A protein has these predicted regions:
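Cell-envelope/ECM-targeting effectors and their regulatory/trafficking segments
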Residues: 2-195
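Non-catalytic tandem-repeat scaffold regions and their flanking low-complexity/translocation tails
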Residues: 139-602
Length: 602
């Protein structure tokens, strides 16, 4: 066979030569090869030399190069290029690992490039080229091209967002991005705030902690969390000031959307409309208007809701992305339909039907994801039959399972319990079946139908064991959901057994806080012990941020149950935990959570 370089020679030398009983050779390989290229090529014959000590039934023989000479075996001097090597060289060059000639010949430079690539990608370093290596190179190349394209798209989006904000005098001052130039005060002492906390000082401490977050993306993230709480509390000026600290102009745009939606939820409709008009991004602006429509419908202001819906609809026509248009159109339909039993005015019903018809018409286009999105819309509108008809065209299990859960809930709302049970039975993945059954049980509990809720939960409990053991978090999450639903249905003993089986420390602690709040609310004899167990489980959580988060959740659960003392003790544990958090990003996140929880006490 022809071999073109020393690398291949070393590969041949590693060949294992096997013989049978002593003196009987069962496999002998001789190979003709050339070393080098062109007129300096050296030709030779490779074969077995001396045998090693034979141990029946096999003998291992070494190999050696013999009959070396130049100019002989001329037919071996022109080795044909390998398509596999050619492709590997091209891919290595594209990835910046190879600068040699792309000729399909495995020379020393190619071998060095292969080894370099193998080292950097944690592959076995042997310098050999195979179909598997070429596949790996192609995958890596595609991934890098995707990253490059995403980077290009991000740059284009940032530039457009910056230009759009700069084009308006009202939003130009939001492009300052002061946080990048601000530095945290190393001598700052937060002890006074944490000793006697209030919402304002906790938010101020969170902003100070954010200054010490050096990675821009994470800093922008936590600033967005701070801003959202400020907006929710009605502190618009402070929220806008925080928005000006955000570096990424796209997130500045999103921040304005958060402010506008918060204003709508608080019933500040004129302010929400004014904020929406400030937002250059049409999707974000339309999202604020959709939230404004929902708030106006709930406030029984049909004329204003109609005008806002028409304004949102006009914006949709200007959004180029079809999927984004459909998502917003679906949200607009649901916003027009009251969720709290308020009778829908005829003018809004007609508008919702018109928008729903437009959504159904989009299915005819056959765009990916449209059928599922419209089916979900029909289910959430309480049209399970239409949703089931659309579901027939869905092939992906996850998409179909989520849709069937929505359909089952819609049927349960209509009192169609058998139909709801049949829809749940069509859900393939057990974690989705549990989620659907829990939602139906919660629906019954909220309507004081606890017997019906218990019957549904009896069906849900065995489903936990059907979730594969490797999905530990999914099993724990399902168990936690069931604990909350069981407590609402009045099944505290079963809830305790379910909570004890939860493997995830954070979710187990959360489940026990729900049990402790329920026990305290009922004045049960074991209420104090239940609270102590919740505190101990929370302290055992490894992550300080998770401990603070879980403690705050416990405080919220206590407040929801009307158990002030438990809520205060849970909050005190969160406060103590935050004092020990040194990481600026985690500290800022925890402080925001503390501020949000404390605001619920007021």
């Amino acid at each position: 066979m022809g071999i073109s370089d020393s690398h291949s020679l070393s590969a041949v030398r590693r060949t294992v030569w096997c013989a049978g009983w002593p003196g009987v050779v069962v496999a002998v390989l001789a190979a003709c090869l050339t070393l080098g290229r062109g007129g300096d090529a050296t030709a030779g014959v490779l074969g077995p030399s001396r045998p090693s000590q034979v141990r029946p039934p096999l003998a291992i023989m070494n190999i050696a190069l013999s009959d070396e000479g130049s100019g002989g075996l001329a037919r071996l001097r022109q080795v044909p290029p390998s398509p596999t090597v050619f492709q590997a060289q091209k891919l290595l060059r594209d990835l910046g690992h190879y600068r040699g000639v792309v000729n399909g010949l495995l020379d020393e430079a190619t071998s060095v490039a292969v080894k370099r690539y193998q080292r950097r990608t944690n592959l076995e370093v042997d310098g050999l080229i195979s179909e598997e290596l070429v596949d790996h190179l192609e995958f890596t190349g595609q991934a890098e091209r995707l990253v490059e394209r995403l980077s290009e798209v991000r740059g284009e989006q940032v530039a457009r967002a910056r230009a759009a904000l700069a084009a308006q005098p009202e939003t130009r001052n939001l492009l300052v991005g002061r946080a990048a130039s601000e530095s945290a005060n190393p001598t700052r002492d937060s002890a006074a705030c944490l000793a006697a906390p209030n919402v304002s000082c906790l938010l101020e401490e969170a902003l100070e902690a954010a200054k010490a977050v050096h990675r821009v993306h994470f800093r922008d993230w936590v600033l967005g969390e701070i801003l959202q709480l400020q907006a929710r509390l009605g502190r618009d000026d402070a929220a806008l000031e925080t928005a000006a600290r955000i570096d990424d102009p796209r997130l500045v745009m999103a921040a304005l959307g958060k402010i506008g939606r918060a204003q709508a939820r608080r019933g500040r409709w004129q302010a929400a409309g004014a904020t929406a008009r400030l937002i250059p991004d049409l999707r974000v602006q339309a999202g604020v208007l959709v939230r404004l429509v929902a708030a106006l419908v709930e406030a029984e202001r049909p004329a204003a809701a109609y005008d806002a819906a028409r304004a949102a609809s006009a914006l949709l026509e200007r959004i180029p992305a079809a999927r984004a248009r459909l998502d917003l159109l679906s949200d607009l339909v649901l916003a027009l339909e009251p969720q709290s039993g308020i009778e829908q005015p005829l003018v809004l019903r007609a508008l919702a039907q018109d928008f729903a018809a437009r959504a159904l018409a989009a299915v005819e286009g056959g765009e990916p994801g449209v059928r599922r999105r419209v089916a979900v819309l029909m289910a959430r509108r309480g049209r399970p039959s239409a949703a089931l008809e659309l579901a027939e065209g869905l092939a992906e299990i996850d998409q179909r399972d989520v849709l069937m859960a929505d359909i089952a809930l819609a049927q349960a709302r209509r009192g169609q319990d058998r139909a709801a049970a049949a829809s749940v039975a069509q859900i393939i993945l057990p974690r989705y079946r549990i989620a659907a059954l829990v939602r139906i049980a919660n629906l019954h509990s909220a309507a004081e139908r606890r017997g019906a809720a218990r019957a549904v939960l009896v069906r849900a409990l065995p489903e936990i064991d059907k979730i594969a053991a490797k999905f530990t978090y999914a099993r724990a999450d399902a168990g936690n959901r069931l604990v909350h639903a069981l407590v609402d249905a009045g099944e505290r003993e079963q809830a305790q057994r379910t909570a004890a089986a939860i493997a995830d420390a954070r979710l187990r602690a959360d489940a026990h806080w729900r049990l402790a709040a329920a026990a305290a609310q009922a004045g049960a004899p074991g209420a104090a012990e239940a609270e102590r167990l919740s505190l101990d489980l929370t302290r055992s959580i490894g992550s300080a941020l998770d401990r603070a988060w879980t403690s705050c959740n416990g405080a919220r659960l206590g407040l929801n149950a009307g158990v002030q003392g438990l809520a205060e003790r849970a909050f005190d544990l969160a406060l103590k935990t935050v004092r020990g958090i040194a990481n600026p990003w985690a500290r800022a996140q925890a402080l925001v959570r503390l501020a949000a929880t404390l605001s619920a006490f007021e």
